């Protein structure tokens, strides 16, 4: 049994790992490269898609599923296994990707082909491919997110996918993996633990209360899948503590995900399930309006506060949030709240550095609004959670992280006696 990384090797995006065992070739994830690595989506995979026997997808984020249509474009015609929640979310995610790609590397016919080959596989169900057996475990990162267990040739491999932050309320905690000979593990936040979630929520509510009380707008850049809905859940469960104000979900894609959530109840935490069992939707706080059309979005810029606006893109790479920032950052009554990762060199990181003004959509905008960064909302496991999950002293190969963060985690694993290395693109690792 061997595992060969073809993405997310000493980087965060592009997850794709080829498992070779029992005469079978199984691809674990097929993710898009993003940010400065985007051009690599046009490059060959590094293996022949026509020779792959099956694909397993851990969750519906683009950096794990975004090259799947390209795989079909280049000749793959086999099954694609994912949990039912991932299957349903992928239709939204891949169709949206078609609209936002600057230089498309697949077309609508490839998306249709890929979606037609999806096969649901639930947690704990074993998939048999000859002498190879595979199953999903709960990863707690998105509804339906999973890690993969692969057994064959007398060896066991675990691939973490993306592991969730276990302090959060919306999703179940990640399950512990079985004993394994090798774990291919993510290390997105391998260099630090997260701030406690309860403290993060408390600070978030204080920002909202202050800003709304003075008639301001709270501008929240959000990811359309999971993070936007999580913030809505916080507003639902704590809204009674806040001044009354409209809440605008200014993201049609996030709105589609929101509409899907009642069909995914069993993938949420027991706390969330309890709300649904009482006939309530805890992702729809009082005063919520989903903004579908561009003209309605622009009208929010002219409307007075108080209000809460959630809009994409979460990393300010484009989208409606840029118009809200262009019109809102110059008003000292307003607040900009980052609840997700902001990459170095991006507009978000520039704003966090608090210059007197920033350039948005071709205009210099004075930065007078308050700016807040709340890292405790992260959807990834922090360093302490990763160390806990990797108990049992398996050999570990680290993926899905910037090199310095993987090195920091690797050092701690080595200090407790575990054999650890960092993945290299195209270099196979024996299990």
UniProtKB/Swiss-Prot annotation:
Residue stretches spanning the membrane: none
UniProt-listed GO biological process terms: rRNA processing
Documented activity regulation: Inhibited by cadmium, cobalt, manganese, magnesium, calcium and nickel ions.
Give the SUPFAM superfamilies listed for this entry: Metallo-hydrolase/oxidoreductase
Hydrolase as a keyword of this entry, yes or no, is yes
Enzyme Commission code:
3.1.-.-
One matching Pfam family: RMMBL
Cofactor annotation comment:
Binds 2 Zn(2+) ions.
Give the location in the cell: Cytoplasm
Give the GO cellular component terms, alphabetically. cytoplasm
Q: Which UniProt keywords apply?
A: Cytoplasm, Endonuclease, Hydrolase, Metal-binding, Nuclease, RNA-binding, rRNA processing, Zinc
Obligatory cofactor(s): Zn(2+)
Q: Does the keyword Transmembrane apply?
A: no
Its top-level enzyme class, in one word, is hydrolase
Q: Name the positions where Zn(2+) 1 binds.
A: 59, 61, 141, 162
Q: What is its main location?
A: cytoplasm
Tell me the InterPro entries matching this sequence: Beta_Casp, MBL, Metallo-B-lactamas, RibonucZ/Hydroxyglut_hydro, RMMBL
Q: Can you tell me which family this protein belongs to? A: Belongs to the metallo-beta-lactamase superfamily. RNA-metabolizing metallo-beta-lactamase-like family.
Summarizing the function annotation, the protein's role is: Has endoribonuclease activity towards 23S and 16S rRNA (in vitro).
Q: How does it assemble?
A: Monomer.
Q: What is this protein called?
A: Ribonuclease TTHA0252
């Amino acid at each position: 049994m061997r595992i060969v990384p073809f993405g997310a090797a000493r980087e965060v995006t592009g997850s794709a790992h080829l498992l070779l065992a029992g005469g079978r070739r199984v691809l674990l994830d097929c993710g898009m490269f993003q940010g400065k690595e985007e051009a690599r989506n046009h490059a060959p995979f590094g293996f022949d898609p026509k020779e792959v026997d099956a694909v397993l997808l851990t969750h519906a984020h683009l950096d794990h599923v975004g090259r799947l249509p390209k795989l079909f474009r280049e000749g793959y015609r086999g099954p694609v296994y994912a949990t039912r929640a991932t299957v349903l979310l992928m239709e939204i995610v891949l169709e949206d990707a078609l609209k936002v790609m600057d230089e498309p590397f697949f077309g609508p016919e490839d998306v249709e082909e890929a979606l037609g080959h999806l096969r649901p596989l639930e947690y704990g169900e074993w998939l048999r491919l000859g002498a190879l057996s595979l199953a999903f475990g709960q990863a707690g990162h998105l509804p339906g997110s999973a890690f993969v267990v692969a057994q064959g040739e007398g060896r066991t491999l675990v691939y973490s996918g993306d592991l969730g932050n276990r302090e959060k309320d919306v999703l179940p905690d990640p399950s512990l993996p079985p004993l394994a000979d090798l774990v291919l593990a993510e290390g997105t936040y391998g260099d630090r633990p997260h701030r406690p979630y309860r403290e993060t929520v408390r600070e978030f509510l204080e920002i909202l209360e202050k800003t709304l009380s003075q008639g301001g707008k709270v501008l929240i850049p959000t990811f359309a899948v999971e993070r936007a809905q999580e913030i809505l859940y916080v507003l639902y469960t704590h809204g009674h503590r806040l001044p009354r104000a409209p809440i605008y979900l200014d993201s049609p894609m996030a709105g589609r995900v929101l509409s899907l959530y009642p069909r995914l109840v069993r993938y949420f935490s027991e706390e969330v399930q309890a709300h649904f069992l009482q006939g309530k939707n805890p992702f729809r706080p009082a005063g919520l309006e989903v903004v579908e059309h561009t003209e309605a979005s622009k009208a929010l810029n002219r409307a007075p506060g108080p209000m809460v606006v959630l809009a994409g893109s979460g990393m300010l790479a484009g989208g409606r949030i840029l118009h809200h920032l262009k019109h809102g950052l110059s008003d000292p009554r307003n607040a900009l709240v980052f609840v997700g990762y902001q990459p170095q060199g991006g507009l978000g990181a520039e704003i966090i550095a608090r210059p007197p003004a920033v350039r948005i959509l071709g205009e210099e905008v004075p930065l007078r609004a308050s700016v807040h960064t709340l890292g405790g909302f992260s959807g990834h496991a922090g360093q302490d959670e990763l160390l806990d999950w990797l108990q049992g002293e398996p050999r570990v190969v680290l993926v899905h992280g910037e090199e310095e963060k993987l090195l920091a985690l690797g050092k701690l694993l080595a200090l407790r006696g575990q054999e650890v290395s960092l993945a290299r693109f195209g270099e196979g690792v024996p299990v």
